[in-house]
From Swiss-Prot:
This is Large ribosomal subunit protein uL2. Part of the 50S ribosomal subunit. Forms a bridge to the 30S subunit in the 70S ribosome. The gene is rplB. GO terms for biological process: cytoplasmic translation. SUPFAM superfamilies: Nucleic acid-binding proteins, Translation proteins SH3-like domain. It comes from Histophilus somni (strain 2336) (Haemophilus somnus).
Length: 273
């Protein structure tokens, strides 16, 4: 994988930094695993904006990813690595011995031709998926389930991983990249290794249009608006003279956003501490 800085042949190319991976498949994706993906423009069924800064962008197909890894004890071979426009990570097309193909998240170090497997008998090897009670303490994993059988929910983006730091009773303790430590049932399944394409964070789009291709619309500062549009709006100059808030008046600096009290007992240490 190479990090390429473009030559300044135009203003839009001057600052572009691209991530080039020659291992990625250059043809079309595997059609039976594609789904439709409709544009919402950030609107709900009433036509009202519920999420700002969404609209336009290139048409995309959804790739159906196997987050559950529930095809047990059947070996599979990696056919190819592919780009996925719906996520920061790359994906791998795997062919199982019984002839079925599935997409999985491509871990770091996985290449075409490698063999992977799921189940309690799977060896501790990059790309293999098994319950965390069978994974040694200290291992790095990704695509971690929060509930047995629900499919991976933690550590799915490019370069993400979780470390198993303890096992006690029916639970394992995980250390997340954010610094949070939380308990998860040891029956939950995780995949060995970290998610690939960790250089994703180093890319530079270089121009506003590149964000528009991705369906991201401009973000206007509150201080640049009128008082009717934002609590920061109006006044002379750029000072708005109050604590910063969202367009709906909710504090933005340090306000707690977590409301799921039911699972607080599983968090051993909060993030950022």
């Amino acid at each position: 994988m190479a990090i390429v800085k473009c030559k300044p042949t135009s203003a839009g190319r001057r600052h572009v930094v691209k991530i080039v991976n020659p291992e990625l498949h250059k043809g079309k994706p595997y059609a039976p695993l594609l789904g439709t993906k409709s544009k919402t423009g950030g609107r709900n069924n009433l036509g009202r904006i519920t999420t700002r800064h969404i609209g336009g962008g290139h048409k995309q197909h959804y790739r159906v990813i196997d987050f559950k890894r529930n095809k047990l004890d059947i070996p599979a071979v990696v056919e190819r690595l592919e780009y996925d426009p719906n996520r920061s990570a790359n994906i791998a097309l795997v062919l199982y011995k019984d002839g079925e193909r599935r997409y999985i998240l491509a871990p770091k170090g996985l290449s075409a031709g490698d063999q992977i497997q799921s189940g309690i008998n799977a060896p501790i090897k990059i790309g293999n998926s098994l319950p965390m009670r069978n994974i040694p303490v200290g291992s790095t994993v990704h695509n971690v389930e929060l509930k047995p059988g629900k499919g991976g929910q933690i550590a799915r983006s490019a370069g993400a991983y979780v470390q198993i730091i303890a096992r006690e009773g029916n639970y394992v303790t995980l250390r997340l990249r954010s610094g949070e430590m939380r308990k998860v049932l040891s029956e939950c399944v995780a995949t060995i290794g970290e998610v690939g394409n960790s250089e994703h964070m180093l890319r530079v789009l270089g121009k506003a249009g590149a964000n528009r291709w991705r369906g991201v619309r401009p973000t206007v500062r509150g201080t640049a608006m009128n008082p009717v549009d934002h609590p920061h709006g109006g006044g002379e100059g750029r000072n708005f003279g109050k604590h910063p808030v969202t367009p709906w008046g909710v504090q933005t600096k340090g306000k707690k956003t977590r409301h799921n009290k039911r699972t607080d007992k599983y968090i051993v240490r909060r993030r950022g501490k």
